[in-house]
């Protein structure tokens, strides 16, 4: 075997994520000295069925690092980094649990990403080229979370994210520039109405003004868009993360109690009032039928499952059978390996489900999800506001890809 591709060793590092929590970085090195790194992100709002992180009782990842330096390094020694599926299958076998709890989804995804990057570098290819080959032709539309609520903020909004979607632009660079302008206009509006103190940023770079009602937040965002003349080019979205305001048999939102049926009517009202192109996790994570009913009522809105599917084909199959959503979030650390992530995206696309490659609220500067979105031809990428380095690293990577390789912007010819 060529020493350029043969794994010599793995090394684990305990690093810091954007929420001041400890996470793991893995370094893979071949005998020829080719090196690749992978970081594990972490969510604040987590699906009950996603891969379990391996963390120490005090929140650190010393045990995970030790596992990489010993068991994983020994087990993967001499493997060919180009054999991603074989390596990921080995990780899954070594773990031996359904929820990745022995090795940890965090340990596994950091290792899996590091293997991918090492192989790509050894071949002299860009990551997106290695992932997608000649299929990689488009830059995804960004979903920018510019106003935060829920578990991502310190205000009283129950809806977790208020999103802008720049669609009708010729280039990604134009789309991101318009989004920056809307973001800054929103900051000005918040300053005027509530004071500069409320322009502090949430976990994902969005603002967290002292709002309590969903419509107040949507009004602020829509006013920012319209004041710049972008109402025909920039659309809106929400991540409700509704499991967080579901209580036994009802939802508590905007100071009211809603049944699932009443909440469907409320979302329909919002979609009639605002250009809502996207709604994520509008119901609690086991309610496939309410997702389906909402999607059937909102023909021009991409109802999307995150906690509903947790990047797991078995859960997505249920959603497809019930026609629960037009879209699915893709978070590699929810499932634990690059191979399983690619299989999930392939399954979604074969069943006409749109894919949204997504960050987590606890991120690092690793920009691999940008390459993953391009390489898999995902329609969307969701990676926060156009601020904070762990968010902008992904946008800056997409700018590089567009300018260096001339790829087209997905929004230019995208139709619902």
From Swiss-Prot:
Extent of the signal sequence: none
Subcellular localization: Cytoplasm; Secreted; Cell surface
GO molecular function term, any single one: magnesium ion binding
UniProt binding sites for Mg(2+): 239, 280, 306
Keywords: Cytoplasm, Glycolysis, Lyase, Magnesium, Metal-binding, Secreted
Reactions accelerated catalytically: (2R)-2-phosphoglycerate = phosphoenolpyruvate + H2O
One Pfam family here: Enolase_C
Cofactor note (record): Binds a second Mg(2+) ion via substrate during catalysis.
GO cellular component labels: cell surface; extracellular region; phosphopyruvate hydratase complex
Main localisation: cytoplasm
E.C. designation(s): 4.2.1.11
Family in the record: Belongs to the enolase family.
Function: Catalyzes the reversible conversion of 2-phosphoglycerate (2-PG) into phosphoenolpyruvate (PEP). It is essential for the degradation of carbohydrates via glycolysis.
Protein name as annotated: Enolase
UniProt source species: Sulfolobus acidocaldarius (strain ATCC 33909 / DSM 639 / JCM 8929 / NBRC 15157 / NCIMB 11770)
């Amino acid at each position: 075997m060529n020493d350029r591709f043969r794994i010599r060793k793995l090394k684990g590092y305990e690093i810091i994520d954007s929420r001041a929590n400890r996470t793991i970085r893995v370094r893979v090195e071949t005998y020829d000295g080719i090196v690749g790194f992978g970081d594990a992100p972490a969510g604040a709002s987590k699906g009950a069925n996603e891969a379990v992180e391996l963390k120490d009782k005090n929140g650190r990842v010393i045990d995970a690092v030790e596992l990489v330096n010993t068991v994983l390094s020994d087990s993967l020694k001499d493997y060919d980094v180009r054999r991603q599926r074989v390596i990921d299958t080995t990780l899954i076998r070594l773990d031996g649990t359904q929820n990745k709890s022995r090795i940890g989804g965090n340990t596994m995804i950091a290792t899996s990403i590091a293997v991918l990057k090492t192989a790509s570098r050894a071949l002299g290819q860009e990551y997106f080229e290695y992932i997608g080959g000649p299929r990689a032709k488009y830059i995804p539309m960004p979903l920018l979370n510019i106003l935060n609520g829920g578990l991502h903020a310190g205000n009283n909004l129950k809806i977790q994210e208020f999103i802008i979607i720049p669609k009708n632009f010729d280039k990604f660079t134009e789309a991101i520039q318009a989004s920056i302008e809307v973001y800054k206009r929103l900051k000005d509006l918040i300053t005027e109405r509530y004071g500069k103190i409320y322009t502090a940023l949430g976990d994902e770079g969005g603002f967290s003004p002292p709002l309590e009602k969903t419509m107040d937040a949507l009004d602020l965002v829509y006013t920012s868009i319209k004041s710049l003349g972008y109402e025909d080019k920039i659309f809106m979205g929400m991540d409700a993360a509704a499991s967080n305001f579901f209580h036994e048999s009802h939802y508590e939102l905007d100071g009211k109690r809603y049944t699932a049926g009443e909440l469907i009517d409320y979302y329909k009202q919002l979609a009639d009032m605002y250009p809502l192109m996207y709604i994520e996790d509008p119901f609690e994570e086991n309610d496939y039928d309410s997702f389906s009913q909402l999607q059937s009522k909102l023909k021009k809105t991409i109802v999307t499952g995150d906690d509903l599917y947790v990047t797991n084909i078995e859960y997505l199959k249920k959603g497809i059978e019930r026609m629960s959503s037009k879209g699915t979030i893709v978070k590699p650390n929810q499932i634990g390996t690059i191979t399983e992530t690619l299989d999930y995206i392939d399954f979604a696309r074969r069943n006409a489900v749109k894919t949204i490659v997504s960050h987590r609220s606890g991120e690092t500067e690793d920009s691999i999800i940008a390459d993953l979105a391009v390489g898999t031809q995902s329609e969307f990428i969701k990676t926060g506001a156009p601020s904070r380095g762990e968010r902008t690293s992904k946008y800056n990577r997409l700018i590089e890809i567009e300018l260096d390789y001339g790829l087209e912007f997905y929004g230019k010819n995208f139709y619902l």
